[in-house]
Amino acid sequence: SERKTERLAQVVSLCKLTELLDRHPYDLSGGEQQRAALAKILLLNPDILLLDEPTKGLDAEFKQVFGQILRTLQASGVAILMVSHDIEFCAKYADRCALFFDGNIVTEAEPRTFFSGNSFYTTAANRIARDVLPDAVTPEDVIAACGGTVEPEAELPEYQRIPPAPEKETRTVKKLPVWRKILAAVS
């Protein structure tokens, strides 16, 4: 349908896949495969996203787009749980961060508190500026604290979640009599 085609074009553009459409999936780089997987998920219009290392292979430019996509999804009511070793990305885009060790959550807080109070698992910006700016966890924090101006993120192309399709009619199935269930189990 026209609506599906329009939606597909929107997601392909958002995930910067236009130039890849004629290529075989085996010819895509790891980052391109991640973008294609993201597009596939976005087309499903999920209510919950469970992401495992979603930034692996993504270039810095698309990580920023991906972060904006996550913020847009969250603002529209999508629940997002992400497992990642990409500390810089988590510091910038996560609402809460946690550290797992030996199968347990050892510590958990909002990103600024989590990364500024952690000497082992923290961002490069925090390691560099820790003695002067202990609360700085992103390069943008350091730039702003030094009086510089941080460029606003580029606008995300128009993206909206499509409402879910109307639920299909459900048919009620007649229950089998007990004797038929027993007969089915025996045969």
Summary of predicted features, one role per range:
Residues L49-D52:
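Catalytic Walker B motif of ABC-type/P-loop ATPase nucleotide-binding domains
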Residues N104-I128:
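Conserved beta-strand-loop-alpha-helix hinge in the C-terminal portion
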Residues S84-H85:
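H-loop/switch region of ABC-family ATPase nucleotide-binding domains
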Residues R3-L20:
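Conserved ABC ATPase "signature" region
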Residues Y121-V186:
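ABC ATPase nucleotide-binding domains
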Residues C90-K92:
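A short, surface-exposed alpha-helical micro-motif characterized by mixed small hydrophobic
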Residues H24-L28, E32:
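Conserved ABC ATPase signature
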